[in-house]
């Protein structure tokens, strides 16, 4: 698909939302994103790191960055809607700081719902989620 898309539209950027691990997803869900990155098929990956645990997030993002190296950008997906009771807006801000400190290209939030609109996004709009300068 990537080869055909690039032939039709040179310069197109191709990304994929992927499961966070690099091995089990290959065997269990036929999602070998580490291979796709190594072959230059993806420009960026968005691992679905839906955890309220900052230590787990840091471990996962460090591994994902190591797996991709300079071949693709890593844009970690965080899931305030998935872990809403444990992943408070304040905790999410700390996790965004962690992701930035680790060198990720950005972040994505799953999924747009009332809580994200009313509780999380106002804090992000206040400036904590602004790109690093």
Model-derived regions: residue spans:
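Hydrophobic, Leu/Ile/Phe/Ala-enriched alpha-helical segments that form helix-helix packing faces
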Residues: 1-5, 68, 99
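Short hydrophobic alpha-helical module
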Residues: 4-8, 39, 48
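Aromatic-lined carbohydrate-recognition surfaces of secreted/lumenal glycan-active proteins
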Residues: 1-29, 73-82
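Short, glycine/polar-rich helix-capping loops at beta-to-alpha or helix-loop-helix junctions
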Residues: 32-33
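Substrate-binding cleft of secreted/luminal carbohydrate-active enzymes
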Residues: 41-58, 64, 70-133
């Amino acid at each position: 698909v990537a080869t055909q898309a690039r032939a039709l539209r040179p310069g197109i950027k191709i990304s994929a939302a992927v499961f966070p691990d690099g091995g089990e997803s290959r065997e269990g869900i036929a999602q070998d994103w580490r291979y796709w990155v190594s072959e230059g098929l993806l420009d960026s990956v968005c691992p679905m790191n839906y955890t309220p645990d900052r230590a787990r997030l840091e471990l996962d993002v460090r591994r994902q960055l190591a797996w991709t190296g300079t071949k693709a950008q890593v844009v970690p997906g965080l899931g305030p809607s998935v872990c809403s009771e444990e992943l408070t807006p304040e905790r999410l801000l700390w996790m965004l700081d962690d992701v930035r400190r680790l060198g990720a290209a950005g972040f994505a939030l799953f999924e747009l719902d009332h809580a994200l609109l009313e509780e999380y996004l106002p804090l992000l709009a206040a400036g904590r989620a602004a790109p690093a300068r």
